[in-house]
Structures are given as structure tokens and as C-alpha cells.
């Protein structure tokens, strides 16, 4: 979403959602689920943050990562969260606040010593936010039961 889609006050000129996460069945080509992703918590008109986690679905600016265990991780919205979704339903099942926004796709690795799987995200700042940083954050996935 560039300025051509915004009013002079910086407000989008179309109705929400402005960004969604979608799952498509690759065999049938049918949409399985679609959910708005992102809030206006860290954005607002005239560059003033709203500080309200209203889930309107914000423009998405990064890649997602799905795991074999049925989790989909995504951080590329204009608020400062890494989210995990259930790949079967699209339900947001976890989120954590990042120090600044991220337009990075999450990465994963498994420790060769412990066998534990980690999700890593780079957070350097989100478009339309003056906040910048230089963070690499790792989260450990729960052990398999």
C-alpha cells in the first residue's frame, strides 16, 4: 500500500482488511481459510500511533514459515508481533511482541546437539514506522509429546 491508496491524512481509502493470510488447497485450488493479519496498534494517521490492537488486517510485507507440526509463523505486518497460526484452521494460537517491526520471513533450525527446533526472526523495523533496530530473536518450539 503506497501513498496513492491513502487519504491526505494517511488513512487507507478502501475498507479493511488491508492484509490477510490465506491457505489454499493445492489439489482443488479452493480457498481453505483466510484471516486478517495485523492491527493498527503501531500505526495511525499523521504518524500518530493508535496504541489499539484493533485487528483490521494490515498490509503484509514478509514471508511466512510453516512447520511440519502444523504451525505457520508470520511477522510481516505493520505491528510489532511474531504470530503463530494453526495451519488447519487459520486460528492465531500464539503471538509475541517484538522490539520493532519485522519485514523478514521467519527461519527455523534444529539443534544438532539437542534436537530442539527454533524459530528465528530478524526485526529491523516495519514500513511506515520510524522505529528501527537490529535484532535477531530466537524462540524454542515446545518439545514433542
Predicted regions and their residues:
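A fold-level detector for beta-propeller and closely related beta-sheet-rich head/sensor domains
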Residues: 1-145
